């Protein structure tokens, strides 16, 4: 299996890349700047928005860890999903894209999105809203085999790989036994690679919780 990883040297993408290589997958890593995360990766220095459909013809899966960053135009997060559609429509390739906790409902009543709550950080609100708009675009598509993987409210960069995670498929946040909505970067990366290997959760928005 060959996968294209967008943002292959970032916080999430480097973890996805490492785990994919450990599974014996080939990795084509797209990076905007910086260095390769591993000498075994076929590196392409290019922005997501400059990728062409033709250069992905040898890839079975695209895993995107793209994020605009906090200081860029939040609308880039919406536009990223439109780019995913352009790159993957009618290819049969499995698109697995990072979403955002803000695009999930707060609970099973499905009345309020997380980004709409007072607790949601102001600097993330427009980013989260645009991610949700992008996911809405995918949900209207019948030409793309997609999965959107949303972190929990606390996306923990330091918790490490526990290997024990829960997946939610109902569109709302999950909470552990301590009442926390938390996932580590490593566990979410593991979930993405598992989904790629198993070709699972097609056309679903899911969330991942570290148990």
For each predicted feature, which ranges?
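N-terminal Rossmann NAD(P)H-binding glycine-rich loop of SDR-like oxidoreductase domains
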Residues: 3-23
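Short, polar loop motifs at secondary-structure junctions
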Residues: 29-36, 153
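NAD(P)H-binding glycine-rich loop region in Rossmannoid oxidoreductase-like domains
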Residues: 35-91
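Glycine-/Pro-rich loop/turn segments that contact NAD(P) or position catalytic residues
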Residues: 72-160
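Substrate-positioning beta->alpha
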Residues: 130, 179-193, 204
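Glycine/proline-rich active-site loop of Rossmann-fold NAD(P)-dependent oxidoreductases
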Residues: 141-142, 156-164, 195-204
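A conserved pocket-lining segment of Rossmann-fold NAD(P)-dependent short-chain dehydrogenase/reductase
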Residues: 166-183
């Amino acid at each position: 299996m060959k996968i294209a990883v967008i943002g292959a040297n970032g916080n999430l993408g480097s973890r996805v890349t490492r785990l994919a290589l450990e599974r014996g997958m080939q990795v084509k890593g797209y990076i905007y700047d910086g260095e390769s995360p591993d000498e075994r990766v076929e590196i392409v220095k290019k922005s997501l928005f400059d990728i062409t459909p033709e250069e992905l013809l040898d890839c079975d899966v695209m895993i995107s860890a793209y994020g605009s960053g906090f200081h860029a135009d939040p609308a880039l997060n919406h536009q990223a999903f439109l780019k995913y559609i352009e790159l993957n429509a009618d290819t049969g390739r499995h698109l697995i894209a990072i979403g955002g906790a803000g695009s999930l409902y707060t609970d099973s009543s499905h009345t309020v999105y997380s980004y709409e709550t007072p607790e949601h950080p102001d600097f993330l609100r427009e980013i989260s809203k645009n991610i949700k708009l992008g996911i809405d675009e995918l949900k209207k598509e019948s030409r793309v085999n997609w999965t959107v993987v949303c972190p929990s409210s606390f996306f923990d960069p330091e918790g490490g790989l526990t290997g024990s995670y829960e997946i939610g498929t109902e569109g709302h946040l999950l909470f552990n036994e301590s009442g926390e909505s938390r996932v580590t970067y490593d566990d979410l990366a593991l979930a993405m690679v598992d989904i790629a290997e198993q070709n699972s959760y097609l056309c679903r928005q899911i969330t991942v919780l570290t148990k």
